[in-house]
């Protein structure tokens, strides 16, 4: 089964814009006191990589961000 947050399936996240939307929707599944922190973290991550142009590097960043989001959501659920 493919995890779906909002209207975006995790497997469909292949562009920075879709990643941003996916991560923000993941933040909405966090406890109230953690939402602001992680939304700020997502924004900062995008600001720090906005000048990245190498498609291979962008895919590496997307893969790592998805792994991190899974880890955080699993941590909150336990």
Curated annotation (Swiss-Prot):
Species of provenance: Branchiostoma floridae
A Pfam family matched in the record: Complex1_LYR
| Similarity-based family | Belongs to the complex I LYR family. LYRM9 subfamily.
Recorded superkingdom = Eukaryota
Supply the name of the protein.
Answer: LYR motif-containing protein 9
Q: Where is the signal peptide?
A: none
Q: Which InterPro entries match?
A: Complex1_LYR_dom (IPR008011), Complex1_LYR_LYRM9 (IPR045291), Complex_I_LYR (IPR052151)
């Amino acid at each position: 089964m493919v995890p779906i947050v909002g209207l975006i399936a995790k497997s469909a996240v292949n562009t920075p814009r879709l990643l941003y939307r996916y991560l923000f929707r993941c933040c909405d599944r966090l406890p109230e006191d953690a939402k602001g922190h992680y939304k700020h973290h997502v924004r900062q991550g995008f600001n720090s990589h906005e000048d990245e142009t190498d498609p291979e590097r962008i895919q590496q960043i997307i893969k790592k961000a998805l792994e991190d989001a899974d880890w955080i959501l699993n941590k909150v659920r336990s």
